[in-house]
């Protein structure tokens, strides 16, 4: 399959947008006065490749309204390999959570952020860990990376971590194995990048196929009509995230037969 060089330049970033980044951790707010006396849980937000914490702000605001302490992380996703990024992003975020009296630590991630969590937890435990929710994670890699990673613009836009997200058996996601923590995965089924969708098995979100978001050991899975670059801002996705944090499962539509609920 061939795509013009001009089109590639417009679409090649695995997350669709490119931002200047710096490694800055935003500390969580104090617990609101109206919240219950029970110690709150901390939620660490990890954005995707070539994004910043700004992409997670709508979600952050909704979680704060639910009385979670939120650490919305900025990390230099285009500068380092996944192993380095996992340490740079997650260790300071945990330190921020632990400054406060909390009853547990959760993660909500977008795209690459989920692979950072998998890598970190493959090497060390987080004693306070409760739940992890991944939005559009390339848990089995992406065929977009397979096809485009050797083109110079891809490396410039996505950095070394982007090149590690292929579907080959030696890619970082595929060497991490099954998960052994409480994980819910939300996949998108809508694409705003039809050129990149040509590389992907349907259904897909324009960057990752629905099938490749799944991982052995996950506790629950749901797909939504959202696209890869915007799924973290999707109202239905945010509702599902909050429900999973509260209950450990997603809101699934009840099965029906002849319009009658089972």
Which residues are covered by each model-predicted region?
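Serine-dependent carboxylesterase/thioesterase catalytic core
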Residues: 41-54, 58, 64-76, 82-180
């Amino acid at each position: 399959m061939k795509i013009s060089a001009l089109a590639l330049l417009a679409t090649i970033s695995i997350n669709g947008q490119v931002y200047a980044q710096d490694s800055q951790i935003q500390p969580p707010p104090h617990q609101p006065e109206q919240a219950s006396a029970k110690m709150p849980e901390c939620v660490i937000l990890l954005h995707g490749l070539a994004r910043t914490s700004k992409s997670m702000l709508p979600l952050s605001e909704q979680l704060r309204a639910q009385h979670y302490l939120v650490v919305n992380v900025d990390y230099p996703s285009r500068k380092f390999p996944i192993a380095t990024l996992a340490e740079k992003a997650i260790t300071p975020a945990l330190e921020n959570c632990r400054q406060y009296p909390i009853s547990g630590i959760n993660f909500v991630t977008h795209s690459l952020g989920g692979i950072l969590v998998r890598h970190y937890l493959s090497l060390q435990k987080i004693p306070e860990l409760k739940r992890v929710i991944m939005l559009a994670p390339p848990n089995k890699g992406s065929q977009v990376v397979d096809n485009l990673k050797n083109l110079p613009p891809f490396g410039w836009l996505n950095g070394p971590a982007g090149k590690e997200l292929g579907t080959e058996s030696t890619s970082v996601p595929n060497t991490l194995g099954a998960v052994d923590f409480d994980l819910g995965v939300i996949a998108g089924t809508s694409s705003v990048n039809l050129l990149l969708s040509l590389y992907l098995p349907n259904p897909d979100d324009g960057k990752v196929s629905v099938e490749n978001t799944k991982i052995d050991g996950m506790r629950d899975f749901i797909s939504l009509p959202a696209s890869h670059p915007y799924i973290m801002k999707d109202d239905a996705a945010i509702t599902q995230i909050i429900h999973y944090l509260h209950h450990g499962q997603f809101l699934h539509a009840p099965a029906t037969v002849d319009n009658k609920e089972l």
